[in-house]
Amino acid sequence: MTGRRCERTTSPGTGGRLRAEPADFQVQEVPAYLPGGSGEYLYLHVEKTRHTTAHVVRELCAQLGVRDRDVGVAGLKDRHAVTTQWLSLPAKVEPRMGDFSLPGVRILETSRHTNKLGMGHLHGNRFVVRVRGAAGMAEQAGETLATLAQGGVPNYFGPQRFGLGGLNAEEGLRVLRGESELRDPRVRRFLTSSVQSAIFNALVSLRLEREVFDRLLTGDMAKKHDTGGVFLVEDAGAETPRAQRGEVSATGTLFGRKVKPLTADAGALEAEALALFGLSPQVFASRKGDRRLIRVFPAEAEVRPEDDGYVLAFTLPKGSFATSVLREVMKTEVDAPGAGPDTTDEGEAGDGE
């Protein structure tokens, strides 16, 4: 169960294969700021192959004698890739860094800064993805990618959020209905976040089906792409031209106690998505909730042909999934390797927490 996910583009797909080896899928974190060079925190620029962020953090703690809560990260990265990101540690461990060793992990750079790195302290992620088994399809890939860069890509949660076959969301539904025997609060939060994500995906799909993906509805909470400002749409006719120019987009609700459901036309569509799961907003009272853009715009989009396929490169805002772009270009479903609480996605953790 991942929530319905209609495609935005109607162009032919390229087909192909992903992740034949880790280097085929590269994720480079785009930090919100760089370390200033001085301060009480040691910043590490780390390259990881076949390691989740959480596993590297655990190894740092074990080898350097620090607590998990003392390690700062801006986002959690997938295991099945080559990923680069910054981490922070108390500066007191710097003399012991020479003792740290983990196969598949390289420290590219170190510096100092005045504050601990916090979750979400990044602008986004740069993806470089090799698609194999798609010889001669680079031009088609480029055309679809250009369409997405111009008009936006559905900001779906990727299959990594749901586990193989969508089992995480199915178990999350049982948790919300009081039918699960799971007691670990961390696992329960992770599973219920999968349900939040599936409902959001269903809402985005409904907006595509009703041809209001790039429009605004009365009652929408819209977000400005340049400043991040959020506002209530009271006159959809007056605001929709801004959406069609890509200046603003609608947001969808990740249900929780601190987020009010939408009203008017937007609220009716959102209620329809929620009804697909047989739930009410009240069952998410244990979650804070959040709002999430229904579309994002791939930036710095490029395609390079290769003998056996092509390489895609693009940048997405934090929290967005490369798989949303890939499924539009390839027109195939992308698998969900090893999804779990420590391997959230190529985007970031924390939506709707």
Swiss-Prot record:
The keyword Endoplasmic reticulum does not apply. GO terms for cellular component: cytosol. It catalyses: uridine(13) in tRNA = pseudouridine(13) in tRNA. Residues 152-296 form the TRUD domain. It comes from the Bacteria. One of its GO terms (molecular function) is pseudouridine synthase activity. GO terms for biological process: pseudouridine synthesis; tRNA pseudouridine synthesis. The keyword Magnesium does not apply. Residues 1-21, 332-353 are annotated as: Disordered. It is an enzyme of class 5 (isomerase). Gene3D superfamilies: TruD, catalytic domain, TruD, insertion domain. The active site is at residue 78. Its EC number is 5.4.99.27. Pfam families: TruD. Residues 343-353 have a biased composition (Acidic residues). Belongs to the pseudouridine synthase TruD family. Responsible for synthesis of pseudouridine from uracil-13 in transfer RNAs. This is tRNA pseudouridine synthase D.
